[in-house]
């Protein structure tokens, strides 16, 4: 149950989408080095509005990816479809940037949360959880 970084998450997502060549390798992120294993994945993620980074100049590829970030990346990669229904998680505010992504993930059967009433958005997402999210979304 190893943790997962933001760089690994976008790489998994990029590969799950067929590893498409990005139109441009240029991003504003100074922490995405040329030749890094995740460079193409990050460029693809930026082009497809999957991520805007942790700031205008950083992606933070080595930072742990949170559950909120993981489902948001996945939701955006799916085209940010409308999320219907009512949020059942006490720890997901309706105004949180990730709220529609969490609702989509629940509706799509990607995740059920960490309990009936919690999603744990700020908890680090484990590699096993991410693989499960990707598998369930592909079904």
Predicted regions and their residues:
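Feature responds to low-complexity, polar/acidic, surface-exposed segments characteristic
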Residues: 1-10, 15-40, 51-68, 76-100, ...
């Amino acid at each position: 149950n190893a943790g997962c970084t933001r760089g690994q998450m976008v790489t998994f997502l990029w590969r799950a989408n067929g590893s498409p060549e990005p139109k441009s390798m240029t991003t504003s992120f100074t922490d995405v080095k040329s030749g890094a294993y995740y460079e193409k994945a990050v460029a693809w993620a930026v082009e497809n509005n999957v991520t805007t980074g942790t700031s205008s100049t950083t992606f933070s590829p080595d930072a742990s990816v949170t559950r909120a970030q993981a489902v948001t990346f996945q939701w955006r990669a799916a085209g940010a479809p409308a999320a219907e229904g009512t949020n059942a998680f006490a720890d997901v505010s309706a105004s949180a940037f990730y709220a529609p992504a969490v609702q989509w993930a629940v509706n799509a059967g990607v995740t059920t949360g960490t309990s009936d009433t919690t999603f744990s958005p700020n908890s680090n997402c484990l590699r096993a959880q991410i693989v499960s999210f990707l598998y369930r979304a592909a079904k």
